[in-house]
Amino acid sequence: MDDIRQTIRTRPREGTARATSAFTELAQQVRHQGLLRRRYGYYWTKLIAAPLVVAVCLATFVWIGESWWQLFTAAALAIVFTQIAFLGHDAAHRQIFVSGRWNDWISLVLGDLLVGMSYGWWQHKHTRHHANPNKLGSDPDIELPVIAVTAETAARHRGPVLTWMRGHQGVFFFPILLLEGLSLHASGVRRVFARGRLERRWIEIAFLSIRLGGFLTLVFLVLSPGIAFVFLAVQLGLFGFYMGIAFAPNHKGMPVVPRDMALDFLRRQVMMSRNVRGTRLLDVVMGGLNYQIEHHLFPSMPRPHLRRAAPMIAEYCRTHDVPYTSVGLLTSYAIVVRYINRVGLGERDVFTCPLIEQRSLIGS
């Protein structure tokens, strides 16, 4: 199993009560270092820049007019929208302001109005993921419609063609991400029109209508239908691909938690998450998601503090014998592909054994 992922695998020494107090101790250290303090200058700079950059891109789009050079504009917009989505992710986790109301409105403007993703849909889905990452029956992120990332999902449908595709699904994983952008928009639209409680429903409907309807109208006013469709394919494809490759290394290929297994908060968040090592440029490119362990332990920690927190939290986990996983970017993708292929081939409980061992030791 060690050839699949680089994990510091050790054993917990303490019981459940001690494990709970261990996180409290870590939280006190993090707070003492000032790593939960808001970074208003950092975030206000980004909040002001976001609409300005979008405006510049759209002005450039209109200025270029009918031309295949617009495909470069499409690529630029894909990058800009993804970076704004990362900023909306920060706001939704209360990283920007102390006020929950301010964070909510920033999330609505960034997510619904600028990117075209429903904040209500994201909040409903992402909150469940954070509560129980990689847990069967609880984490919606491991219930994908096309790719099977758990043995339970892979076993539901069988047949010669599907069996072959599942056995090679790691190869198809990245091309499928090209459809993720369209899926994110569609999921948001379905959510705002679905039954059930949704705060600020009409605001979301209005913002999504302006963003999606306005953007489509502008594209077809400036471009001929042929170029317009290719432009949208490039913009949506690259947007979805960028979003997908930023989120994929975080948990895929990490242990899948059985439905009946209970873990303390520290192990539940650390053992199911993977950090991606890299430079500050990688921090920008991945929107801070490369510090997934720190983010899961302290969701409201401002993005600029994650890099500072990582060495301290890694050392704390080593001291308390909690497996802390950190790999390079290319290694993380290789792990994801190999793991998805193994699941597709029908291997069961690929990473369950270490979890069962941990649970038995925690309870001892």
PLM segments and residue spans:
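Short, charged cytosolic
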Residues: 2-29, 172-183
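Membrane-embedded catalytic scaffold of the fatty acid hydroxylase/desaturase
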Residues: 35, 76-197, 258-349
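Alpha-helical bilayer-embedded segments of polytopic membrane proteins, i.e.
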Residues: 38-84, 111-116, 167-184, 197-246
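Long, continuous compositionally biased terminal/linker segments
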Residues: 55, 59, 67, 344-355
